[in-house]
A protein has these predicted regions:
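Juxtamembrane interface at the cytosolic side of transmembrane helices
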Residues: 78, 86, 178, 224, ...
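Basic-flanked hydrophobic alpha-helices used for secretion and membrane insertion
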Residues: 315-568
Length: 684
């Protein structure tokens, strides 16, 4: 019986004696389980599922569970490598004392079982306790009524238990792979084996500089939001690769340069730190690069999602400037004439009046749209032979009658034949003439007129709004030409947007039960659609606000959750980096003390090393964030939020708060390093 429990006791004893190493790892595992359970539970929550906007949030949270699962696998593998490295000498001693590789494998198996049981049990217990708090926070972000029913998601419990069972099994198999084929002597000497600096430092450093410069140039040169969306992930990959190259090879190059500077290098506070850094920078640089990337991810996520959440009402108002928006479209023979538009207007107002409301702040206009590829000031409508790269350049062209634009905006603009006004959205139009498919050319009298908000802001593609006289005549000419040239038929649309004095729950179909104006208008327009052969749509700001809040609130909540995970991951990496380097430097500082180096000199040397490398990730993350700002701004435009001042504010506050947290971590981990290299050496 004692033999059966021997391996379990050895595993537990080894973990307990190395608690300085294992405790952060166990906490990290439990934290990952906790976060995964909460996100999985919320993504399938019945409470959120029955709320307006809850569906959008659920989709976002499901994506978050995938991110957590993948990150947990990578991060736990990374941190476990520190544990194995520190335990290799212990395993070598077991081997020398008569234990075979199979016996050591049993110890590792029991360590895995104990780790899985402790962390999964603790994480799930905390998850069940804190789940309701997270759900209440999510409900609060969605701005919907709160429910206090306590629920336990059995499916989420099983999913978390299964996922982390697989992760710990893979970690165990990797540990056994590392153990297999290594001799006892190699295990005993593992802690004294130095890390060789990477070869061809100058080549790798130059590659990192080129990659980073290319990513930065890409970030500041892209003008269209859709192009920013498509190129964003390519830029992210380039920045990640460049960061690793610069921290691994660039750090070695920096250390070699400092060693050549005799006035700097041959000082007590610099000599030990620089010489030790030069021979361990491959692993040290990778850790610092990981911290830099995690810090950048946190800053980008929290600044952008905070900006979205704070500015969500601005986004709603930009997309829906009025309470209701009615659209009638689909006539290919001719746009609605004034008499037909008046008939529709009276029908809509009569429906609103019969429902008990009144219309105000009315905006009504007609428009017709085409799309094509810009070639200077010419928009080419025939896209045959266009490449995949051209998809980001496709531009929507909306033509509006001058009289409708004036009525909708309250202006009194005038135009002569052949003249137009242009408003550019999500693109630039610096030209004095506008040509449509090489045939119709207009002189642009003003390129900066205020665009009509509403449906135009919903397009994610570059858009030009063109205001022109003699609208009906031009549309007929355009349709005749396009029909003959491409076989196309145009779609004309009539918009009627207005405010109403009805309460929000009677404006749109919010809860699916209350009679509302949106359903009444759809009923009236269904008859119009049948009689006239046109398409119709009715959109309510009140009903769509819930979807906006669901999407933006979900992104904000996910940004907070992932930021917490990434911050703790960065802290764990920094802690293990300082811990492992502290143990490796302990003997070096012990020798330096014996030849006359004082505790004050040791402290100065430690501060020199920490200040040299510890703040590099934060500084470079700040630089990454500055160059990512144009990308972030353009991506937020795709969410109908174009508020540069708000984004600057949230970005600055996010960086300031993160910098304070980073400084606190620097202080704590620096003290850990100092205690290992200074106080432990004194005991000898």
């Amino acid at each position: 019986m004692r033999e059966k429990t021997l391996y379990a006791r050895l595993a537990w004893t080894g973990m307990r004696k190395n608690r300085r190493l294992y405790l952060p790892y166990l906490l990290s595992c439990a934290g990952m389980v906790l976060m995964f359970y909460i996100l999985t539970g919320l993504s399938g929550s019945e409470v959120l599922g029955h709320m307006s906007g809850g569906g959008s949030s659920a989709i976002i949270l499901r994506l978050g569970t995938v991110v957590i699962a993948v990150f947990a696998l990578i991060f736990l593998f990374y941190t476990h490598s520190f544990l194995i490295r520190r335990r290799e000498r212990e395993f070598g001693l077991y081997n020398v004392l008569g234990m075979g590789k199979g016996n050591i494998a049993r110890i590792l198996l029991w360590e895995t079982v104990i780790t899985y049981g402790l962390t999964t049990g603790t994480g799930l217990l905390l998850g069940v306790v804190l789940y309701k708090l997270a759900e209440l926070g999510m409900v609060r972000l969605l701005q919907v009524p709160v429910t206090y029913t306590l629920t336990v998601s059995v499916s989420s419990l099983l999913a978390a238990a299964a996922l982390f069972a697989v992760i710990h099994t893979l970690i165990l198999l990797n540990s056994l792979r590392q153990l297999h084929g290594v001799s006892a002597v190699a295990l005993l000497r593992s802690e004294s084996v130095g890390e060789k600096p990477p070869r061809a430092q100058w080549v790798l450093t130059a590659a990192g500089v080129v990659l980073l410069g290319a990513a930065y140039a890409l970030a500041v040169s892209i003008k269209e939001p859709l192009a920013a969306l498509l190129w964003f992930f390519a830029a992210v990959i380039m920045v990640i690769l460049a960061t690793y190259l610069l921290f691994i090879s660039g750090s070695v190059t920096l250390c070699r340069g400092l060693q050549r500077n005799k006035k700097y290098y041959y000082r007590p506070q610099h000599f030990v730190s620089v010489s030790s850094m030069a021979y361990r920078m491959k692993r040290n640089g990778a850790g610092l690069a990981s911290v830099c990337i995690l810090a950048t991810m946190v800053l980008v996520m929290i600044s952008s999602t905070t900006c979205l959440y704070v500015g969500q009402e601005d986004a709603v108002n930009a997309r829906y400037p009025r309470d209701m928006d009615v659209a009638v479209y689909g006539r290919s023979d001719h746009p609605l004439d004034e008499a037909e538009a008046e008939q529709l207007r009276q029908g809509v107002e009569s429906t609103v009046f019969n429902f008990g409301g009144q219309t105000s702040n009315v905006a009504t206009y007609r428009e017709i749209s085409v799309s094509g590829l810009p070639d200077g000031g010419d928009l080419r409508l025939g896209n045959a032979g266009a490449s995949a790269a051209d998809s980001t350049r496709v531009t929507q062209l909306h033509f509006l009658p001058l009289e409708d634009y004036n009525a909708a905006t309250g202006q009194s603009l005038t135009l002569n034949d052949g003249q137009v006004y242009v408003a550019a959205l999500r693109t630039d139009f610096p030209y004095d003439t506008l040509t449509v498919d090489g045939e119709w050319t207009f002189r642009v009298m003003d390129r900066d007129i205020p665009p009509l908000s509403g449906p135009f802001t919903a397009d994610i593609t570059p858009t030009l709004m063109v205001v022109m006289p003699h609208f009906t005549q031009f549309v007929q000419e355009l349709e005749d030409g396009l029909s003959e040239k491409y076989g196309w038929y145009l779609t004309a649309t009539w918009h009627y947007a207005f405010d109403t004095d009805l309460p929000e729950n009677q404006q749109g179909n919010i809860d699916g039960t209350t009679p509302n104006l949106e359903d009444a208008l759809n009923g009236y327009l269904a008859g119009v659609s049948s009689d006239w052969g046109v398409g119709v749509s009715v959109e309510s700001k009140a009903a769509n606000r819930a979807d906006f809040y669901g999407t933006y609130g979900g992104l904000f909540f996910l940004g907070i959750m992932l930021s917490i995970v990434f911050i703790f991951a960065a802290v764990a990496i920094l802690y293990y980096k300082q811990l492992s380097e502290g143990y490796e430097d302990q003997s070096r500082f012990d020798i330096m003390q014996k030849v006359g180096m004082t505790k004050v000199d040791i402290r100065r040397s430690i501060n020199s090393q920490l200040l040299t490398v510890f703040y590099l990730p934060l500084v470079l993350a700040g630089v990454h964030l500055c160059f990512a700002f144009p990308f972030i701004h353009k991506l937020l435009i795709l969410f109908n939020l174009d508020n540069r001042g708000l984004l600057i504010g949230t970005t600055a506050v996010s960086f300031a708060v993160f910098a304070v947290l980073y400084a606190i971590v620097y202080k704590l981990t620096g003290n850990t390093y100092y205690r290992i290299v200074a106080e432990d050496t004194e005991k000898e």
